[in-house]
Amino acid sequence: MAVFIEKETKILIQGFTGKMGTFHAEEMIKYGSNLVGGVTPGKGGQKHLDRPVFNTVKDAVKHTGATASILFVPPAFAADSAMEAADAGIKTCVAIVDGIPSHDMIRIKRYMRRYSRTEKMTLVGPNCAGIISPGKSMLGIMPGHIYKEGRVGIISRSGTLGYEAAEQMKNLGIGISTSVGIGGDPINGSSFRDIIEKFETDDETDAILMIGEIGGPQEVAAGEFAKENMKKPIIGYIAGLTAPKGRVMGHAGAIVSAYGESAVEKVELLKECGVTISKNPSVMGETVKQVLSKK
């Protein structure tokens, strides 16, 4: 069973009738995702892309049985939308939205504490590419045609580096079980550690490619967890080897501020944890191939 989404997974779009919601809904439908409807307050009862529109996520879940959603709403409304999804029983929610205030992300994470581990919604993002299980379903904004179905899991803070890895692997005949873009913000819904733990128990995943960058302790925390708890091999790439300290590089979370947050330091610490490191982005696929050949 794939991580997070299957071909049958029923999906909602929050912000369904807006420009971005409409565009990516069409792309997801073309890919084969089971999009059963969407939510736009005030437009309940209408049809959009031949699918029902609801005023609330609760109504949408009640009438469609949806278990996954994706947010295409303005940053100011993203926190309330995510919490509404959790309260409605959504199991997996992807927040594509860029620019969500850090205080709002803290509010979401605090709100989610009211749920038990088994009831808690998985939030992926914000500022991310989303999730794709090639050949099954897409809950995101990635170009689906570059993904080949296979048995390597990808986790990436950067959307475009995730795409690059997928394309390289496809050209080498290596497929992907699930690819998850966790986003480049300092505070996100799911961490590297959260996702590699799921891949470890996934019977469709044999190895994991983890694509990180400067800033924050997430990559090293995942490596330390893997060293003590995982058997599946992990390949890593850390972007930002030449990035100076104290300067934001692209993503809001990509800033080196403490020991263990630079690319060089992360690479050394991950090597100590048994992670195989790709030296540069152009050989991510080749590095995965080398690791798989040793299994």
Task: Describe the predicted segments one by one.
Residues 1-295:
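Catalytic-core regions of core metabolic enzymes
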